[in-house]
Curated annotation (Swiss-Prot):
Mg(2+) 4 binds at residues 832, 834. Pfam families: CPSase_L_D2, CPSase_L_D3, MGS. It comes from Lysinibacillus sphaericus (strain C3-41). Mg(2+) 1 binds at residues 284, 298. Belongs to the CarB family. Pathway: Amino-acid biosynthesis; L-arginine biosynthesis; carbamoyl phosphate from bicarbonate: step 1/1; Pyrimidine metabolism; UMP biosynthesis via de novo pathway; (S)-dihydroorotate from bicarbonate: step 1/3. GO terms for biological process: 'de novo' UMP biosynthetic process; glutamine metabolic process; L-arginine biosynthetic process. This is Carbamoyl phosphate synthase large chain. Signal peptide: none annotated.
Amino acid sequence: MPKRTDIETILVIGSGPIVIGQAAEFDYAGTQACLSLKEEGYRVILINSNPATIMTDTEIADKVYIEPISLDFVSRILRKERPDAILPTLGGQTGLNMAIELDKSGILDELGIEILGTKLDAIHKAEDRDLFRNLMYELGAPVPESDIIHSLDEAKRFVVKIGYPVIVRPAFTLGGTGGGICYNDQDLEEIVTSGLKYSPVTQCLLEKSIAGYKEIEYEVMRDAVDNAIVVCNMENVDPVGIHTGDSIVVAPTQTLSDRENQMLRNISLDIIRALKIEGGCNVQLALDPYSFNYYVIEVNPRVSRSSALASKATGYPIAKLAAKIAVGLTLDEIKNPVTGSTYACFEPALDYIVAKIPRWPFDKFESAKRNLGTQMKATGEVMALGRTFEEAMLKAVRSLETGQVHLELKHAEDNSDSWIEKRIRKAGDERLFFIGEALRRGVTIEQIHEWSAIDLFFLNKFKNIVDMEQTLADHKNDKEVLRTAKRLGFADKKIAELWDTTEEAIYAYRKEQGIIPVYKMVDTCAAEFESETPYFYGTYEEENESIKSEKPSVVVLGSGPIRIGQGVEFDYATVHSVWAIQEAGYEAIIINSNPETVSTDFSISDKLYFEPLTIEDVMHIIDLEQPIGVVVQFGGQTAINLADKLAANGVKILGTSLEDIDRAENRDKFEQALRDLNIPQPQGETAVSTVEALAIGERLGFPVLVRPSYVLGGRAMEIVYNQEELQHYMENAVEASPDHPVLVDRYLTGQEIEVDAICDGEHVLIPGIMEHIERAGVHSGDSISVYPPQKLTQYQKDTLVDYTTRLAKGLGIVGLMNIQYVISQGEVYVIEVNPRSSRTVPFLSKITNIPMANIATKAILGKSIVEQGYPTGLAPEQKGVFVKVPVFSFAKLRRVDITLGPEMKSTGEVMGKDATLEKALYKGLVAAGMEIRTEGTVLFTVSDKDKEEAIALAKRFSTVGYRIVATEGTAKAFEAAGVRTDVVGKIGAKGQTLIDLIQNGEAQLVVNTLTKGKQPARDGFRIRRESVENGVPCLTSLDTAEAMVRVIESMTFTAEEMPKAEVVH
């Protein structure tokens, strides 16, 4: 069937902001799909609320709407654009749920709009737990004993029948939100209640737990004429019971016999055919390790996290082909873009092993529960390729950037044997490293298997790694042993430790002995056909397949796995930088380790190396490619941190020089630079010990802001209010960087301003100034930011432009820079300068139409801003108002305090744009998932220092018709100021307490400002967590609450009594 000609315009629904469970893989899928549809000649309209992605660039679709993905806004766009069809299966769970809502509302029938790709009834059959079960019975596919429940009583009846443990899976949710494994009645009550709350249809599936089975996934594709193929099969190293997004995964499957593989493969193909899915689909199965029994766990009828992994693991572009299938093309008509000669109906074959390890945010959230279950907690993932399981695994560990280069714990000796057993029995983010330690202590693989249910095959491979450590230690300087160790993926750093020498010495010795990696091509067909993909991984074998090109090349370092503080914004900048390098006539080479992103799509760069971002792995590539230089400013802190080691190896750093990067990042040098330039900054000093820090605190006066130098996303940054808190901080957090001192600053309250600029060495271009709604002290990534600024005077704007221009030139910036200012009592102070691309670059580039990463890259390559045809100074302000609103994933992380502070906590962002600030804020808040009601109840619990401000807010809430509720102290203050307030009991009081109020859904909004101290057991913490678990918006900054009330005021009509005439005597 050739492609359809009866449709012209297609609306693609994006996946919205990045949250845990739905990350950059959908930006990748959506970008691929839009380009793929345009390639076939369709007119593509995109709606997505996320400004940080490549997908929402105007080149990707014919029309791009950055608007909330809500029934209201999507319907408006449908009415305005009248597309012929919509394609929802590439926008993750957001896209699917939106399609179902649109269908229910009747607008699709009314406008005659068709749904492309997988049909709605197939989506229902896969997502609705009841329909899915019935379909499996018809196919004769076994599913675990289960029951659909709508209330806690039904759940209890089911458990009486089959006993514990049971798994709870809420319907139509993402990343297992609200689900979990129950071992007893208490778990059941907690998890079922939360599951019913998070399911949009209040429905959960309870099933008999088959934890301990092998978890196998098949990524399959089918077209409209029933051709179906398996693109990739994958095996979770962790057994069933851990969400696949939190599992370590290998491809292809390692421990299945041919019979098992064929059996599971056939059922996967039967399922996709029975569901009549057109496009990609992911089938998860559980296999009993001791027999041929298996169960079908679930089916995702859409492009998913696993399909992004499968695409990168095999080189087979699933999303691109799914889009073509959606418009009627068939697998035997579509050329495989990798080989350029075979068709898409050939199943990929792998002659290497792929390992994926999730990246968790626990380094940012110390108080979070670290155990893993059916609810996903990872923010991102890394992938590595190798010729042996050991090599792929160790390369993946190095890619995580958690400071580990090997299968070992930090401070392993502090762990008792019983603690190690406990951490292996209960899955957690460090289980892999605990297994390594257990093997070193002589625990047998059979014993570890009994504790963890991880297959002996994998444990044996981990044992090979541990045995090799001993062999290396026994054979110092033996080059054959060295060669074997490198084949198992050992890092030079680890070998150096075992041989009592330095990493550099090992690297030099290997080069001299000719023990260097070769680069193999990822070609989808195990080298059966000629292939033209420039996609490589390194391994220690004979033949090198990566040929250095004739053209001069530039290497761009990517930003590694997505984590809090370093999100998809940096990938955006990386991709734009690559395009600019190509436009300037050079060959662009990318090194990155993240399978979810656009930058690791082989069609983006001239060459893609899928390797860890460590000095060893990067130097190998540079030795081979001999580029004219390396660009480090787009890869976030990951790339900046490699700069000094690269320069020490004689590599040219393009753009801002290493000395100048250091002048911006090193505190003492930075302060000196500001003094030379005569630019004011908050008073501050540097401490290298606790004693010194306490003395500085005394001198400056509290509160002070403390942080280590050289960190991203405000890691280990805190505002402390007294000596005890400062001492606690110095003793617990400063390990964040032992070689670097700690900065102690006077904490200025005031408005925070952020400026991005581009400098070519002599000219400075400032695309825009952004104003934060939350006052200084909230991390810039967690603040709502507004463009153009609404409150600045002309004098302040001029001062900001002047300081920014002087800083850019004075610090020798070439390329991008980001500066944060605070305006305290009318004066402008500099807080910090980042000599690199920042997380506001995509947002600013889109709203000002100044392609910042592109201009900066060309400036780095020697073409001035003026030569590129851009003006200097502050660009003229755009019409309208644009806001960037942070999005958090607190519902996924139990026990994390949601208070905003100097340490970043948001995982993603959305944009709202409109004619006025209030309208833009409304869209931003709605897109970020807040429900804004024009009436309801607002609960205030504020600290004494905030009472004054809170009274003014309470008055405004009351005027628009909200009921005000507060605890006794606050209520008294409100009443005294003339605000009608209902009193509610504190936690633990008799009668109705505020926790009851939140749990019963009586509050639509909670305003809770910090009570001092970071102790989680505090009442404030309980209130904030209860709000999150009950889906009530909780604002921890009065500035955000003020923004919210402005929006509500702008939506409501007033009802004021007539003024009385004054009596005249």
